[in-house]
Amino acid sequence: MLHLTLEDQLFLGQPKQVGTHSTVHDHLAVMFEDDGETGYFYALDMRQNAQPIVDCLHVYNVDNTRNHHEARKLEICWDENGYLALLLINGYPHAVFDFAHLIGYNTNKHPQPDLMSMWTHEEITNERATAWLGVNTIK
C-alpha cells in the first residue's frame, strides 16, 4: 500500500522544489526539483549533516518534452514500510528510490551514482511499475 504524502500541480520548466519525509523514518526524505531546464528527484538522509543528498535521478529535460506548458499532476508516495519513495507525474512512476536496497529507478539510469556511494541505478520497467502501483502503468 502506498501513502500519498504530496500532491501538487507541475508546469515543466517553471522552477519548483517540493519534498516529503518518509512516513515511517524521519531521517529519510525525497525532494523533486525543476530548475527551469531539467527535473531531478533527490534522495536525502538527514542524518548526514554535511551532505544529506545521497542520490539523485534525472526525470526530464524540458526541451525534450511535448506540451510542457500544460499542467501535470505531481505526486510523491511512500510505501507502508517507509523505505520506498515514488515520484509520479500524471500517475506514472518517473523516479523511485528504494532506501532499503539503495537502488534508484528511472527511465535512463542517469546520472550514475557517486562511486563512493553504495547506491545503484536500474531502469523502471512495466513489471516494476505494476508491482509498485498494483496496475499496469507504463505503455
For each feature predicted by the language model, list its residue ranges.
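Beta-strand C-termini and the immediately following turn/loop, strongest in propeller blades
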Residues: M31-D35, A43-M46, L88-G91
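Structural signature of eukaryotic scaffold interfaces centered on beta-propeller domains
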Residues: L2-D26, M31-D34, K73-E80, E122-K139
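Surface-exposed loop/turn elements that mediate protein-protein interactions on large endomembrane-trafficking
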Residues: M1-L10, F41-R66, A95-T120, T130-K139
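Extended alpha-helical scaffolding segments
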Residues: L74, E80-N81, I89-N106
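Non-catalytic amphipathic alpha-helical adaptor/oligomerization segments
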Residues: R66-L74
